Amino acid sequence: MAVMEFRGAYDYLSNFYPSSIEFDGITYCSAEAAFQSQKCADRKLREQFAGLTAVKARHRGRQVDMRPDWEQVKLGIMERIVRAKFTQHPELAGRLLSTGDLQLVEGNAWHDTFWGVDLATGDGENHLGLILMRIRAELLAAT
């Protein structure tokens, strides 16, 4: 069995879920805001994402000059941010653990086949889902 979308009862798995996160000394309103900020090489620019909603951060992240190593570092950054989200919020960690051994799939209709899976075609690498399952395993091992 699988969780196919990070909505409804599973909305907390989404990076757009409103939960504060401290990352590299800056507190953001969501994991998405933290992630989008990391596209900027300059800390002052990253700080501008701190008060943005997830939607506004995603929009702003599409307008910044991306750091030159972004493609090489984005997976590691995402994993660190998602780990921070769940370790900083024990109630969210408990909810993640409650998914047991369900496969976590970031199914979407916007054709993101890197972080998720296109629900129309079933294609996708599902990197966000894989990160969540790794973090779930880490949390389970720590209990």
Predicted feature descriptions by range:
Residues 1-143:
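Charged, low-complexity intrinsically disordered segments
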